[in-house]
Swiss-Prot record:
Catalytic activity of the protein: Endonucleolytic cleavage to 5'-phosphomonoester
Taxonomic placement: Bacteria, Pseudomonadati, Pseudomonadota, Alphaproteobacteria, Rickettsiales
Record InterPro entries: RNase_H, RNaseH-like_sf, RNaseH_domain, RNaseH_sf, RNaseHI
Residue ranges constituting the RNase H type-1 domain according to the UniProt record: 2-143
Domain of life according to the entry: Bacteria
Single GO BP term: DNA replication, removal of RNA primer
Cofactor dependency: Mg(2+)
Single Gene Ontology MF annotation: RNA-DNA hybrid ribonuclease activity
Amino-acid positions noted as binding Mg(2+) 1 in the UniProt annotation, renumbered to this chain: D11, E49, D71
First-tier enzyme category under EC: hydrolase
Organism: Wolbachia pipientis wMel
Name this polypeptide is given: Ribonuclease H
Length: 145
C-alpha cells in the first residue's frame, strides 16, 4: 500500500520575542482539511515555528509522504542542513555552544523520521493562501487566551 500524500502548512508568531506566542498547522489530505493551533506564554518565535511543525506532524496516524511548507528558514535549514551536524557534535553548534531549542529539535527529528518529508520554504506574506491562513491562525491563538 502506498503512503498517503499530505500537505502541511505551518506558522508561528510571537507578540514580543520573547512574549506570548501562537502556532498553527493546516493539514490537507485529498478533500480533507484540519486546522490546529495553540498558545504559549513567554516563548519565542522560533519555538513557535518548531512547535507548529511538531504538532502538525503528530496529527498524522500513519507514515505519509508530506510536502511541508514553512516560512521559517530557521526550521527549514535546521532540519535539512544543521541537525545532522548537531547530532554528530553532541548537540553542539560549530561554536561549541548548546543548540538552542534542543528539546524541540530532538522531538522534531523523532516525529519527522516517521515520514518522507519534502521541506519547502515559502516567503511570508507573499500571498500564498495557506501560509496566510496559518499565519492568521497563529496570531488568533495569541489573542484567544
Amino acid at each position: 500500500m502506498s503512503k498517503k500524500e499530505v500537505i502541511i502548512y505551518t506558522d508561528g508568531a510571537c507578540s514580543g520575542n520573547p512574549g506570548a506566542g501562537g502556532w498553527a498547522a493546516i493539514i490537507l489530505f485529498q478533500d480533507y482539511r484540519k486546522d490546529i493551533y495553540g498558545r504559549e506564554e513567554n516563548t519565542t518565535n522560533n519555538k513557535m515555528e518548531l512547535t507548529a511543525v511538531i504538532n502538525g506532524l503528530k496529527v498524522l496516524k500513519f507514515s505519509c509522504n508530506i510536502n511541508l511548507y514553512t516560512d521559517s528558514l530557521y526550521v527549514k535549514h535546521g532540519i535539512t542542513e544543521w541537525i545532522n551536524k548537531w547530532k554528530m557534535n553532541g548537540w553542539k553548534t560549530s561554536n561549541k555552544k548548546s543548540v538552542k531549542n534542543m528539546e524541540l529539535w530532538k522531538e522534531l527529528d523523532n516525529v519527522a523520521s516517521q515520514h518522507e518529508i519534502d521541506w519547502k520554504w515559502v516567503k511570508a506574506h507573499s500571498g500564498d493562501k495557506y501560509n496566510e491562513e496559518a499565519d492568521s491562525l497563529a496570531r488568533k491563538a495569541i489573542i484567544d487566551a
